[in-house]
Amino acid sequence: LRQGGLRIRDAYAASGSKGKKSDSTAELLKIKEEVLTDVYRVLSLCLGVPPTEFEWTMRDASDKVISTEKYTPKSFYQKYINADLDGNYVMLMNDPTREYGKVYEIDYDRHVYDGKNWVYVNLPIERIREVAIASLKDNTAMYFSCDVGKFANARRSLLDIANYDYESLFGVKFTMDKKQRVQTHASGSSHAMTLIAVNVDENGNADKWMVENSWGPDSGVHGCVVMTDEWFAEYMFRVVAEKKYIHADILKMLDQKPILLPSWDPMFAPED
């Protein structure tokens, strides 16, 4: 792949030296297709030819088979999801290094190379908490990202800033707040999970949350981890929520022209 990239660069440079750079697109695309053909061949020999369909078995809570059917990726999406994933969801970020109430775009941070840059509304943690509670109360889980390694106790499956008393252990004060930790790359969005539950007290305030991780059922409790609300405030960075759970004043912010941030911005650079 890198060899092919160099070949394309050399061809582009050569076309410029001949004064024909504007006519080089077709030739460059031809080289790109040749390179990708070789890449596809290598991957197929090593991993197998990508299947055009797959078999999926649905089971109930007692592991009893309900149905087994064949799908293509598109037919599976149409049957089990069939939602407007492009226009119905909003990314909400808590980045204290940037002004709240503004919309930001991260250059080249995308799900796929030729897709769209990630765009998010930057909000105080209190506003994000409101949206998350509303969504979970309606039994709707959310994409969620955080700095998962901080104050994590794997044995207890608990994320809690009170898990470890580093100040007493080392006799050193740790005074950086969330903003300073992001600015110095001491903290950032490092891992994504699914936010699936919240516990609220008699006043409707969240005191703990639950996420489902992607590390398998042997990690955490059946694959799930609990975090305190204090940890949520300090180390949670973003959620993606449906518009129906987001207040109108936040949705109005999407009318702004996004402020473009570089791909090496501290908020995204450390990400897995």
Named regions from a protein language model:
Residues L1, L6, K137, G149, ...:
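Residue-level marker of positions within ordered structural domains that often coincide
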Residues L1, Q183-G216:
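Catalytic nucleophile-His microenvironment captured as a short glycine-rich beta-strand/loop
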Residues G4-K137, V148:
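Core regions of eukaryotic protease modules
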Residues G4-L6, A11, G48, S157, ...:
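Glycine-centered flexibility motif
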Residues C46, Y143-C146, C224:
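Generic recognition of cysteine residues
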Residues T72, P124, D177, T228, ...:
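Helix N-terminus capping/helix-initiation residues
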Residues V112-M193:
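Long, positively charged binding patches that form subdomain-scale interaction surfaces
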Residues D201-D272:
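Conserved catalytic-core surface of thiol
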